[in-house]
């Protein structure tokens, strides 16, 4: 049985996408079902919308995030059976909930954890996105540290504030360049206060208040990231990235050590981007 979990999504548009996907599969598979239950239903294949993250006992007790509770239970009880995850796109991301494309992964949603069946792909899907791959930047000024939502599931439980402070301290040992930190818009002022508190005695560190990632990338020498999706924006813009997590989608073409900050690896982007275009599918294709 293939079970689609409607309540794994919060927004009505996302639930509708699951319903549409179910109808498409049901035309070919007699055992495709969809449920509005917030409990795991035994099945051969589970289909959910969105990633899952660890919740505290308090969150479980107060039922603060029923969709995450459901997805955690599915992951736990479903075991090693196939799990299909629909997530936000990797390329051509938009601000807001509705997207033209969605990432579809098997058993996970991150690099080196999920299976996307996208090795050595042709460039056709990438070309349809209308994206430009700028030449690797020969010169740049500042280092851009890419922050993430403090509660982001792609952190896999990592402490983003600790990562930011530790990363900047390491950078200060290896470069004299200005270090800019770009925060996630949903974090409020918490990380800005952390930057001020920890680096008030140096002018080398700056809290970046640019409105867009493109503005932040302007004249950047290199980025440092955990699993931020902005890593892909950076390499498209010609700015190399040093990811500190193997679950970052630019891991395969990048340096992995902050010691390389002055001469970061600039690997082949084209095949990576072609492959990533085959990890996401349009709403029309899913329907």
Residue spans of the language-model regions?
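Short loop/turn segments at strand-loop or loop-helix junctions that form parts
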Residues: 4-8, 49-52, 86-90, 140-152, ...
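Catalytic donor nucleotide-activated moiety binding site of glycosyltransferases and closely related
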Residues: 5-8, 167-209
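Short, well-ordered secondary-structure micro-motifs within conserved domains or adaptor modules
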Residues: 35-70, 75-76, 223-226
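Leloir-type glycosyltransferase catalytic cores
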Residues: 96-140, 251-287
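N-terminal pre-catalytic "stem/leader" segment of glycosyltransferase-like enzymes
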Residues: 1-53, 151-152
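Well-ordered, non-membrane alpha-helical segments in soluble/globular domains
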Residues: 14-25, 60-72, 159-170
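A donor-sugar binding/catalytic signature common to diverse glycosyltransferases
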Residues: 55, 210-255
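Active-site donor-nucleotide binding/catalytic segment of nucleotide-sugar enzymes
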Residues: 134-189, 273-284
């Amino acid at each position: 049985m293939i079970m689609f979990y409607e309540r794994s999504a919060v927004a009505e548009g996302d639930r509708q996408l699951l319903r549409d996907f179910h109808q498409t599969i049901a035309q070919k598979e007699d055992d495709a079902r969809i449920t509005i239950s917030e409990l795991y239903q035994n099945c051969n294949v589970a289909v959910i919308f969105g990633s899952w993250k660890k919740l505290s006992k308090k969150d479980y007790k107060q039922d603060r995030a029923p969709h995450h509770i459901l997805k955690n239970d599915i992951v736990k009880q479903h075991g090693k059976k196939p799990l299909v995850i629909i997530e936000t796109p990797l390329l051509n991301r938009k601000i807001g909930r509705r997207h033209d494309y969605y990432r579809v992964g098997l058993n996970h949603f991150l690099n080196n954890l999920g299976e996307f069946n996208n090795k050595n792909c042709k460039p056709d899907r990438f070309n349809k996105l209308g994206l430009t791959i700028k030449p690797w930047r020969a010169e740049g000024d500042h280092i851009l540290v890419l922050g993430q939502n403090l509660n982001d599931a792609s952190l896999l439980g990592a402490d983003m504030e600790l990562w930011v402070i530790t990363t900047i301290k390491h950078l200060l040992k290896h470069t004299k360049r200005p270090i800019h930190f770009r925060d996630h818009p949903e974090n409020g002022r918490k990380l800005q206060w952390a930057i001020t508190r920890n680096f008030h005695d140096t002018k080398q560190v700056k809290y970046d208040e640019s409105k867009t990632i493109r503005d932040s990338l302007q004249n950047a020498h290199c980025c440092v990231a955990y699993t931020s999706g902005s890593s892909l924006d950076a390499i498209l813009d010609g700015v190399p990235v040093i990811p500190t997590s193997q679950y970052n989608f630019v891991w395969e073409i990048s340096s992995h050590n902050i010691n390389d900050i002055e001469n970061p690896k600039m690997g082949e982007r084209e095949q990576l981007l072609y492959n990533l275009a085959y990890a996401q599918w349009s709403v029309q294709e899913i329907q």
